[in-house]
């Protein structure tokens, strides 16, 4: 039931705690004496709760093993009914054990950092204010709630309100009063590193400290520094479709994941992690964000890509050509096809064609069996009546209708046709026999035959995959995913209107859609944010314009390359980005190596070397891997690691690094308006330090 690894966790953790306690706690900022005393009290109560939780785990484990041993020992003597009851009891014991282990693990996590804030709130009906401590999880001791979950209604006061009149929405209704105190803490290893009195939402000093930390191989929770505009998104319960347009570094992905944690907490009776999925651009990004929800006490959600969905829908139907990188393909006709199919106009053309599918695909004739007849015009009317159904499902329903009609008229008890034979006859009346034939006819009918090319027999170009699935939906129907009740779509700017149309057919659920239309990496995608808003006319639309990732100097530099007017940097200062001229390629490699050595001697944890294309990244990796331990991030990669990573701009989207090096920033590599967008993306991956190297002439996109 409970693994040895889980049972050993307490020993390992307490050993770590003992070692940490030998270290002197940081004395960065003198804490309030009352807060030191309170933290000591909470620590003692947590350690006592852990001991009790540990005892509970061991007791349940013993109970489970005793019951299991009894069932094995007396298996031959126990009647089936008693065996069933014993197995049921064993399952219940196991469930209690799982819950006990989860509770103990939660307490272990709390012991490191029990809470991060305190608020004092005086309700209108009270004479003295109550103090509330806010943490990652709630904690009760002897029936007294000592720490409140960051998602609880009362915690909204910390994120949204300043000192003074305030209120929050509780299950019982609106609670009003006065917020009299706000304190923020940094607690590590259950020691107070600092405590600050605050009158505003999130003390800038704490935000600066947290943003100045080094990056890691996993995205972290941001519960201690959630900003007011982010909190409004996280606690949004009503929006069926929520679109978040967020600039680079605005925390949009983290906010979306925190929103899921909040919704699971708020609607735990009907929503769990099993009912949530995220559509992410690649496996590396999925791995990078995989720690956020577990860190918040929730299970990891299901992660998938558009490629995964396509292969699942088209398995055994047709093959899919490997996707091409628009930056590395020189094929004007292919580029024209891809661009055309990325537009909202293309989706409208498909809808126009499919609206006339009745006359396109079906030419009924009379159906007779013995003395029974279903006239062609009656069949046609039934086909039109089922316009909301795919073609194949229409035929199935008509076959059932014909059988029912014949049966109702069968006064002489004559033999009737089998429904499957009726369906076979109806299928023969189709002018178009399958979805692929229908898709080909669309191009012919709309006089755009040159826009459809099959690279090989029974193989589709990637740009045709989702349009074809859309036609499959109209002809065969798609299997809707009923289990997913909330879908997150990240990097929304990378997906075409047709892809969204298919997703809407597959996932008829609540959606959080996020991205940045200033970070499009596919040169052939012509769709816009307005197109997306047209697709989701009733959606709530929110913009996040403040960037928290990069220093003021890095953001200012990035804005000089691509002037994103709405982008607002945080006042966190650092070094000005370095632009280094190299006389030749050998000197550029030597310069990059020198920067790597400087990184290795620094306190920074992650370095990203970002090139324009995947092939350029691979070429540099082949050189640098002979001298350094480096990781190459490609489309086949599945994880993000700390240390030195080499990748393309396309693969770096959504990731962040302490330091970034961008090689070959010359006129030959970066010269077009589109290249300015790529450079902007690469620059905004850097948190603390940015270096650009070049040979020949410096790109004119950079204003020095």
Model feature map: region roles:
Residues 264-487, 494-502, 510:
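Alpha-helical nucleic-acid-binding subdomain
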Residues 249:
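Walker A (P-loop) phosphate-binding loop of P-loop NTPases
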Residues 269-270, 274, 283-291, 295-299, ...:
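Conserved helicase motor core of SF1/SF2 NTP-dependent helicases
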Residues 1-223, 227, 231-235, 699:
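Extended, charged low-complexity regulatory segments
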Residues 244-246:
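Hydrophobic anchor at the beta1->P-loop junction of P-loop NTPases
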Residues 252-253:
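Conserved lysine of the Walker
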Residues 238-242:
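Pre-Walker A (Motif I) flank of P-loop NTPase domains
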Residues 256-257:
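Post-Walker A alpha-helix
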């Amino acid at each position: 039931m409970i693994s040895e690894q889980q049972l050993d966790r307490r020993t390992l953790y307490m050993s770590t705690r003992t070692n940490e306690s030998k270290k002197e706690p940081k004395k960065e900022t003198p804490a309030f004496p009352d807060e030191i005393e309170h933290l000591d009290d909470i620590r003692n109560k947590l350690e006592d709760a852990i001991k009790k939780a540990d005892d509970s785990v061991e007791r349940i484990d013993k109970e489970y093993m005793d019951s299991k041993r009894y069932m094995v020992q007396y298996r031959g003597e126990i009647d089936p009914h008693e065996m069933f009851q014993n197995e049921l009891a064993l399952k219940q014991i196991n469930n209690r054990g799982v819950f006990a282990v989860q509770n103990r693990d939660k307490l272990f996590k709390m012991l490191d950092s029990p809470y991060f804030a305190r608020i004092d709130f005086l309700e209108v009906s009270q004479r003295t204010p109550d103090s509330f401590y806010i943490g990652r999880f709630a904690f009760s001791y002897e029936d007294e709630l000592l720490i409140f979950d960051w998602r609880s209604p009362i915690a909204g006061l910390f994120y949204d309100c300043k000192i003074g009149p305030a209120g929050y929405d509780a299950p019982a209704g609106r609670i009003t009063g006065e917020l009299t105190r706000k304190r923020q803490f940094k607690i590590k290893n259950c020691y107070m590193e600092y405590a600050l009195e605050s009158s505003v939402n999130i003390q800038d000093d704490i935000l600066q400290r947290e943003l100045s930390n080094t990056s890691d191989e996993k995205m972290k929770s941001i519960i201690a520094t959630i900003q007011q505009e982010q909190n409004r998104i996280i606690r949004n319960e009503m929006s069926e479709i929520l679109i978040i347009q967020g600039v680079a570094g605005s925390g949009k992905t983290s906010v979306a994941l925190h929103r899921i944690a909040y919704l699971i907490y708020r609607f735990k009776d009907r929503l769990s992690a099993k009912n949530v999925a995220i559509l992410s651009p690649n496996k590396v990004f999925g791995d990078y964000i995989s720690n956020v929800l577990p860190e918040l006490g929730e299970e990891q959600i299901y992660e998938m890509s558009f490629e995964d969905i396509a292969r699942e829908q088209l398995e055994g139907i047709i093959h899919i050509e490997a996707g091409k990188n628009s930056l590395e393909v020189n094929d004007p006709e292919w580029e024209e096809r891809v661009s055309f199919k990325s537009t909202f106009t293309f989706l409208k053309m498909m809808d126009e064609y499919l609206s006339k599918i009745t006359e396109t695909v079906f030419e009924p004739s009379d159906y007779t069996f013995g003395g029974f007849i279903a006239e062609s015009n009656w069949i046609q009317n039934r086909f039109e009546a089922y316009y909301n159904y795919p073609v194949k499902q229409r035929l199935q329903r008509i076959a059932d209708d014909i059988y029912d009609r014949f049966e109702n008229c069968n006064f002489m008890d004559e033999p009737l046709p089998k429904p499957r034979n009726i369906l076979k006859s109806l299928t023969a009346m189709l002018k178009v026999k399958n979805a692929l034939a229908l898709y080909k006819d669309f191009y012919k009918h709309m006089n755009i035959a040159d826009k459809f090319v099959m690279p090989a027999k029974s193989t589709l170009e990637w740009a045709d995959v989702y349009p074809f699935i859309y036609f499959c939906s109209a002809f065969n129907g798609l299997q809707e995913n009923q289990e997913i009740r909330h879908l997150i779509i990240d990097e929304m700017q990378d997906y075409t209107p047709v892809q969204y149309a298919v997703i809407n057919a597959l996932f008829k659920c609540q959606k959080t859609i996020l991205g940045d239309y200033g970070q499009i990496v596919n040169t052939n995608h012509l769709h816009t944010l307005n197109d997306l808003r047209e697709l989701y006319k009733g959606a709530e639309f929110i913009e996040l314009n403040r960037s928290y990732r990069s220093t003021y100097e890095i953001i200012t530099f990035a804005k000089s390359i691509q002037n994103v007017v709405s982008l607002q940097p945080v006042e966190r200062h650092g070094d000005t980005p370095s632009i280094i001229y190299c006389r030749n390629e050998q000197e550029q490699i030597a310069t990059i190596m020198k920067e790597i050595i400087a990184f290795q001697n620094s306190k920074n944890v992650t370095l990203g070397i970002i090139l324009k294309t995947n092939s350029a990244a691979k070429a540099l990796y082949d050189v640098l891997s002979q001298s350094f331990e480096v990781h190459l991030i490609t489309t086949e990669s599945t994880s993000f690691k700390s240390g030195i990573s080499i990748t393309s701009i396309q693969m770096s989207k959504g990731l962040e690094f302490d330091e970034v090096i961008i090689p070959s920033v010359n006129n030959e590599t970066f010269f077009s308006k589109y290249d300015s967008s790529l450079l902007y993306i690469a620059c905004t991956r850097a948190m603390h330090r940015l270096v650009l190297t070049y040979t020949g002439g410096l790109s004119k996109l950079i204003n020095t």
